[in-house]
């Protein structure tokens, strides 16, 4: 599993090591271990995606706009009890593509992860890794959930 806390530091990491701003902006990432960030997250749970900082698989996360009031309340208690374990990000509008589901086409959310090779020259490979949210309406595009 990767540590999602690093997402919050990416603009500073790029600036420090490369001496330049990021070309493609990073998704804003709120660290629940930070008092101001945690206060913002708790006030905006209905707008944010909250993830465990050191876990993978797309499980145990809260997609605020799709969560019930009770689910948001339970997550607020988890965040308060163990703030270091959580980060939050805005809910993104993912692309949709036709996907074969049960023998016919249906629209599903996807994400695309490009690959770049670095050596004497830098190459952006054509295509990339595309992951799909197979559950209708889901925003969770994770290979461990069939995507």
Report the location of each language-model feature.
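Domain-scale recognition of functional cores that engage charged ligands
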Residues: 1-145
């Amino acid at each position: 599993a990767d540590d999602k806390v690093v997402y919050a530091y990416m603009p500073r990491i790029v600036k420090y090591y490369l001496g330049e701003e990021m070309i493609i902006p990073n998704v804003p990432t709120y660290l629940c271990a930070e008092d101001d960030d945690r206060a913002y997250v708790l006030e905006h749970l209905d707008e944010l995606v909250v993830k465990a900082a050191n876990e993978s698989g797309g499980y145990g996360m809260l997609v605020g706009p799709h969560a019930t009031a009770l689910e948001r309340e339970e997550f607020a208690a988890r965040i308060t009890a163990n703030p270091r374990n959580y980060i939050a990000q805005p809910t993104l509008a993912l692309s949709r593509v036709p996907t074969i589901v049960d023998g016919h086409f249906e629209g599903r959310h996807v994400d695309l992860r490009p690959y770049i090779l670095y050596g004497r020259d830098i190459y952006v490979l054509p295509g990339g890794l595309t992951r799909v949210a197979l559950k209708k309406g889901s925003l969770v595009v994770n290979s461990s959930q069939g995507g």
